[in-house]
UniProtKB/Swiss-Prot annotation:
Gene3D superfamilies: Nucleic acid-binding proteins (2.40.50.140). It comes from Geobacillus kaustophilus (strain HTA426). The keyword Protein biosynthesis applies. This is Translation initiation factor IF-1. GO terms for molecular function: ribosome binding; rRNA binding; translation initiation factor activity.
Length: 72
């Protein structure tokens, strides 16, 4: 899958789960399970419930995603 095929949406973290997983509510009302991208993990950026984030979704599985950016 090419990187161009991802769907980028914004959402809010509602719950922190084990193993750096998060439950994120998207702007359209859907809830997805998201993990942290490598760059965020590498730079020790903390993500807490209530944070606004950008999530990349694969067109093949819209229930899982990757958090690529945390807004300040």
């Amino acid at each position: 899958m090419a990187k161009d095929d991802v769907i980028e949406v914004e959402g809010t973290v509602i719950e922190t789960l084990p193993n750096a997983m998060f439950r994120v509510e998207l702007e359209n009302g859907h809830t997805v399970l998201a993990h942290v991208s490598g760059k965020i993990r590498m730079h020790f950026i903390r993500i807490l419930p209530g944070d606004r984030v950008t999530v990349e979704l694969s067109p093949y599985d819209l229930t899982r995603g990757r958090i690529t950016y945390r807004y300040k």
